[in-house]
C-alpha cells in the first residue's frame, strides 16, 4: 500500500510542474511533450531490454496493439492534457482528469455490453454533478471563461483517451505483464511526439532557460518514469479497488499544492464539486467487501 501512496503523490506533481514551465517560459505543448517523452525514453528502453527474454513472446499483432495503445494512452492523452493545462488550473484539471474510472464504466457498457449496477449509476450522477459545479463556477462570459471551458474540454478528452487505453489494454496487460506493457507502449509512443516536434517546431524551440530544462528533466523522470512503474507494481500487489481508493489522494494533493505554490484560485464551489467527483469515483471504483 505504501507503494501506491508514493506513486500517486509523486504522479500528482506532474500538472504542477507543467504549470511551472508555462509560467517560467512560453513553451508550446508540442515542445514540452517532446522533452518529456524523449528524456524518459532511455529509461523505458532500459526496462524493455531488461525484460527482453520474458514470456510469452509478442506476436506482430501484439506489437501493433501495444503501439496503438501507447499512442492513445501516453502520447495523445498527455498532449491533450498539456494543451488543456494552458487554460485551466492544475487542481481543477486533475479533478476533471480523475473522471477516467467513470469513463471506463461508460466505455465498457457501450462497447463490451457490461451493464452498470445501480450503485455505479448513482456514482455517475454524483460525479458529473460535481463536474458541473466545477465548470459552472468558471463558465462566465468573456474570453477568459471561454478559454477555461476550452481547456476543460481538452483535459476531459485526455481523460477519455486514458480510459480507452485502460479498457482496450486490460486483456493484453494480463497476458504479457504490466511492466512489459508499460515499457513497450511508452517507448513506442515516443515516436509520434518526436516526429510531431520536428515537423512543427524549429530547432530554436529547444533554446530554453536552464530552469525549464530542469523542470522537464524532473517531469520526465520523477513524475513520469518513477510513478508509472511504482503504480504498476502497486496495482499488482494490492489490486484495483484499494488502488482506486488511494488514487483519490492525487487530485486532493494537486488542489492543495497548486493553491499554495501557484496561487491558483480554488473556490468553495469548486471544492464542493471536487468532493463530489472524488466521492463518485470512489463509489464506482471501490467494490463492497
Feature map (PLM): residue ranges:
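Membrane-interface helix termini and inter-helical loops of multi-pass transporters
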Residues: 16-27, 83-86, 135-148, 197-211, ...
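Glycine-/small-residue-enriched transmembrane alpha-helix faces in small-molecule transporters
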Residues: 1-34, 71, 144-171, 191-195
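Hydrophobic/small/kink-forming positions within alpha-helical transmembrane segments
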Residues: 12, 16, 70-75, 79, ...
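Loop-to-transmembrane-helix transition segments
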Residues: 1-7, 35, 55-80, 150-158, ...
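Specific transmembrane alpha-helical segments of multi-pass solute transporters/efflux pumps
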Residues: 10, 15, 45, 49-97, ...
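Hydrophobic/aromatic residues within transmembrane alpha-helices
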Residues: 21, 32, 36, 84, ...
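Helix-helix packing/entry segments at the starts of transmembrane helices
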Residues: 32-35, 74, 78, 92-99, ...
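Hydrophobic transmembrane alpha-helices of multi-pass small-molecule transport proteins
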Residues: 44, 107, 116-138, 193, ...
Amino acid at each position: 500500500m505504501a507503494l501506491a501512496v508514493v506513486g500517486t503523490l509523486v504522479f500528482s506533481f506532474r500538472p504542477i510542474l507543467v504549470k511551472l514551465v508555462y509560467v517560467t517560459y512560453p513553451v508550446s505543448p508540442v515542445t514540452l511533450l517532446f522533452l518529456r517523452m524523449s528524456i524518459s525514453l532511455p529509461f523505458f528502453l532500459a526496462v524493455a531490454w531488461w525484460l527482453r527474454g520474458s514470456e510469452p513472446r509478442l506476436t506482430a499483432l501484439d506489437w501493433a496493439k501495444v503501439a496503438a495503445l501507447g499512442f492513445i494512452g501516453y502520447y495523445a492523452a498527455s498532449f491533450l492534457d498539456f494543451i488543456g493545462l494552458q487554460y485551466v488550473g492544475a487542481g481543477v484539471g486533475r479533478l476533471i482528469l480523475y473522471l477516467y474510472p467513470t469513463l471506463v464504466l461508460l466505455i465498457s457498457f457501450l462497447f463490451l455490453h457490461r451493464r452498470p449496477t445501480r450503485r455505479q449509476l448513482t456514482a455517475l450522477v454524483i460525479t458529473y454533478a460535481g463536474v458541473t459545479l466545477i465548470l459552472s463556477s468558471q463558465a462566465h462570459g468573456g474570453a477568459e471563461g471561454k478559454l477555461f471551458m476550452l481547456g476543460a474540454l481538452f483535459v476531459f478528452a485526455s481523460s477519455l483517451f486514458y480510459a480507452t487505453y485502460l479498457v482496450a489494454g486490460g486483456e493484453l496487460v494480463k497476458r504479457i505483464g504490466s511492466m512489459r506493457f508499460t515499457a513497450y507502449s511508452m517507448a513506442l509512443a515516443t515516436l509520434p511526439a518526436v516526429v510531431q516536434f520536428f515537423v512543427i517546431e524549429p530547432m530554436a524551440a529547444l533554446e530554453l532557460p536552464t530552469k525549464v530544462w530542469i523542470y522537464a528533466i524532473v517531469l520526465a523522470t520523477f513524475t513520469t518514469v518513477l510513478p508509472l512503474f511504482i503504480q504498476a507494481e502497486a496495482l499488482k500487489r494490492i489490486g484495483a479497488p484499494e488502488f482506486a481508493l488511494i488514487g483519490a489522494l492525487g487530485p486532493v494533493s494537486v488542489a492543495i499544492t497548486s493553491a499554495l505554490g501557484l496561487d491558483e484560485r480554488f473556490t468553495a464551489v469548486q471544492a464542493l464539486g471536487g468532493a463530489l467527483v472524488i466521492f463518485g469515483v470512489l463509489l464506482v471504483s471501490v467494490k463492497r467487501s
